[in-house]
Amino acid sequence: EAVNVAIEDRDIPDVLVVKGRDNLLRLIEAGMIEDLTETYEECTTDTIKEMYDSYGDSLLQSATVDGKLYAFPNTVIDDGAPLLWLRKDWIEKLGLKEPETVEEALEIVRAFVEQDAAGDGQTIGLACSTDVIAGADQTYGVDSAFIHAGAMPCHWILDESGDVVYGSVTQETKEALSKLRNLYEDGILDQRFLLRKTENIDNLLKTGHCGAIYGRWWAPNNPLSAAYSVDSNAEWKPYLLDKEQVNETQKISVFESYDQWMYVVVRKGYEHPEIVAKYVSAIFDQSRYANDASAREVNDYFSINVDPTARPLNINVDYEDALYRTTEHIQAALDKTLDVSELSGLEKSYYDTCKSFLNGQLTTANGWAAYASRIEAVGELQKAGIRSAQTLPLENVNAEIPQELQELENEAFLQIISGEKPVDYFDTFVVEWYANGGKELTEQVQNAYESGKD
């Protein structure tokens, strides 16, 4: 709506972050933003260009019309698979062994509940959001349960026949829901998850009543750092289990739609269009990767978990495998197999924070979070060698799932998990999903995929 008004009034800021490729195209068609092709070639560092190249051609192509680049796209690095975070101190307290399989881990969660690890009769099981699927930027989803079943819900994917299908309507998703239902019936999944809001689960972590969550590598930053601030003896440890199945699921071809992507554009006629190229190069190359004392303050902010949205432009530009590169270098420096002088500015900041934490000089939650996320969690992902398949671009189609179908899906998932509906109700849900617009939407996405191959 804001873009509509801006186009109608022909009034936009000199530099603007635009959400969605559709809005970007409208600004281009209205002739309101600068062609940044020359700016990109002449004012962007080689390192930034390498970063964009690491995603293949599709990312920059999404900001290109008639051979002209009109925006600097945001990049989304490979975040790896979700991990299971368990209270290791509880495992030791109950005299249990650390898990090597998903089944062993779930039995540990059962023991947390049945033996009341919290000690006051209020221990809950595995936390679960009513959104069920957290994706790469939310908390408390049970995404791993789907990954372990070979499912990719909430994504457009290619099936084994090479056809487009919405991942939430596959038999693998049904299998995952069946397993979650069993966990709920067995008391392993939080029995009151339907009533929980995010802040309620946050509080259960802080008060020491929850000892199991699924989360990405950054879970120590959010939500676990808040719990650590209250009780530094709560030892949360990440586990990546059933690695072979996780690796197979991560290889599924997933489509990437640019409907929700962020793009930085420059107003047509602005005297200094090069400012975006210089900003991106300064923040994401020279500050992050050069070991430059002048950039130390910026990098120190990141290493102690300062919200990156405090940047002037809320985007990120980095290598697709930046997460693994950074941790590999920090770990090597900690092991003394890499000289600290060879670390980038950002890596040096994390190295200093992690070293201070290990030496006992930095005992804050931010110090723990830096080490637990960058070294322990990413280290688990690195050891497994699991990488996500490169996404397939999805252009010239609105692939977003309508609100009606989103609600139908979420309600069906919750009803099946909680036992309100039988597992076979999933088949009814699939029929309804296709009948209420899913069939036409799937055909549109299939056609867009086919035309994009030509």
What are these model-predicted stretches?
Residues 411-454:
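Histidine-centered catalytic/metal-binding microenvironments
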Residues 2-58, 64, 89-100, 114-118, ...:
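Extracytoplasmic "Venus flytrap"/periplasmic binding protein-like
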Residues 37-42, 64-138, 158-216, 263-299, ...:
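Helix-loop-helix "hinge/cap" segment bordering the ligand-binding cleft or interdomain interface
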Residues 6, 47-86, 154-155, 162-169, ...:
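A structural signal for short loop-to-beta-strand junctions that line the ligand-binding cleft
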Residues 72-74, 163-166, 391-400, 415:
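A ubiquitous short alpha-helical element
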Residues 278, 285-411, 420:
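Conserved small-residue motifs centered on glycine
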Residues 131-139, 144-154, 181-342:
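Extracytoplasmic/periplasmic substrate-binding proteins
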Residues 35-54, 97, 153-171, 244-253, ...:
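Short, solvent-exposed loop/beta-turn-alpha elements that line the ligand-binding surface or hinge
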